[in-house]
Amino acid sequence: MRDSNHRSLTSNKPIVTITSTVYDRRALDINSSIPLINSLNYLTYLTSNSSKVRETVANDGALERLVSILRSCHLSLFELLDLDLENFNEHENIKDLWKEKRLALCAWKWTLTFQCLVLTGTRGTEQIRKKVVMSGVLSVLVTVLDNYLLYHKNYDFIKDQTMTFDFKGITTETMYKFMRKDENETYQQYIEFITGQDKLKLSTDKNFLNERLVAPSMTIPTDFSDIWGRFADLASNFEPDQERHDDDIDIDSEVESENFDAHKNFFSQPDINRPTISTPREFFLGRIVPKQDDVIWSLQLLAFVSKYTYMKSTLQNVELVESLSFRSMAYKIKQRISEENDLEEQERDVTVKLSSLYPYLSKNPENNSKVKALDTSKMDPFFKELEELSNRCQQEEQNEICNNHCPVLNLFERYRVPKPSDDNAYGKDKERINLRKKISDNFERRWSYDKMKKELTNIVYKNKVLTNVVNIFPLVEKYTVSAENTHDVIYWSSVIMRNSCRKNEILGVRQCANFSCGKWEDFPRQFAKCRRCKRTKYCSRKCQLKAWGYHRYWCHEVGSSHMRSTNTTTGVNTPNEPSSLNATATTAADVSNSTSTFTPNISTTVPDEISNRDENSIPE
């Protein structure tokens, strides 16, 4: 395949792609979507069947590149508002096709990259799984699980409650009219507030389309834009011949003009029967909506990673990916709702105070204007003080304006002619050195790092620490609820929760299973075990009662059929021998201490290559 847009300008040549028999790391460093999707398609097949490829991927930096691809699978605010398609407003069909193609390519990159990471982690060795964790994939997994609860369940797991508004409906017209800051706020400004401002300011230039500074490629979306522009110019300049007076010629010219107008409006008319581009994932405000497959893949990878106790501290401190997460949107909506509630309370308080001061306001509306003419001596002392303060501030502002705009009587009044001296340069340097020394001494006298307060304030701690760092285990615990999830989701989430109860292999102590507590044992066997499952430990009866609300969904009695099935299975597939990915699990990640090689239910047949065509061409 050939493409001129390569990350490395020195390697601007025909693109290297991954095939079913050859793995090449350079194929992952391209920006063009179609060749990259082809390479990811074959890489999914290779990582599922070849242990050598999995080991190579873990050591050549491909894991970090795959994670960066996942983090980039979203639409910027520039693309979300369709500002890159402003010149194609008259061609609705082409505009819709381009939007569908852009979403489809982004979704396919997400799906295939996710599969590559999951297959590498679930089928790899312990060292490979450690590399997978170090690549930063945990942030993506937590974001997927959190987004699924926010979007599909309308549930905030951090506050452990259902949200007071419909998250899916924040883009509707009704929600926009209810949530907008004022009547002057447009829908575009409302979307900008929800999704967050871009670091690059949105341009109002009409020719900004040709620059494409924010778009992934530096070309116009389609090669037909110039043709359509000429076609429109031809339509504006087209006029029938005015010199012909023959009736037949007039009739023919009218027919030709009608046909021409019909062809002119061809691109602007919506085509109901046109084929649509299939997209494996939906998008909401430019961000991918996770499906149940994404949840299962995330839980499977976490199940194999969480069985290593030395990774528990890493799993308990994971940051969400801001560009992919829905949590920032939900937080801004809650903030807007709280601001409106505060304004309503303030208006209510002011109304109550005015009604108490002037009881006749509500009874005689026609006499309300008399309040303005009340004598200041009869006003409340607090309001009188506020009025005096306001008058004083206005007077100070007027005085400051007058002082700043005072006319200059003599233009050379402040001009100073330097005296001729041989030591002028030396004197300036000496003054500069003295000034620098004075500033340094003043800084050292007033500032000391030893005496500086290093504690974070409550506001900074809540906004910068608590909101960004997430504990995986209480999030996964929400997926163990049997009434809300499928069998696969319940199984893998239960595996992760049982892995969280493992004791530290170095110290031999366990952590309290109440995640809001998180206390560790001072010595082995200090805490009491759950009498039913004999796995979880609690530091007190209070913690056990508090955690039972969700622990009861994954608490299996010792000797039950579930425990026997997980303890008696011994089959382990060797990494060197490819096995069918559609087979069921032969070992549980929470029981086996060896390298488990269960693979998710992902198709690994040799993929068909996508048609070799330019990324900017119109999809058929």
UniProtKB/Swiss-Prot annotation:
Task: Kindly indicate whether the keyword Metal-binding belongs to this entry.
Answer: yes
Residues annotated to bind Zn(2+): 530, 533, 551, 555
Report the subcellular localization: Cytoplasm
Q: Name one Pfam family in it.
A: zf-MYND
Zinc fingers typed MYND-type, residue spans: 514-555
Instruction: Extract the GO molecular function terms from the UniProt entry.
Output: zinc ion binding
The UniProt entry's sequence similarity note says:
Belongs to the MUB1/samB family.
Summarize the subunit comment: Interacts with UBR2 and RPN4.
Q: What is this protein called?
A: MYND-type zinc finger protein MUB1
UniProt lists the gene as: MUB1
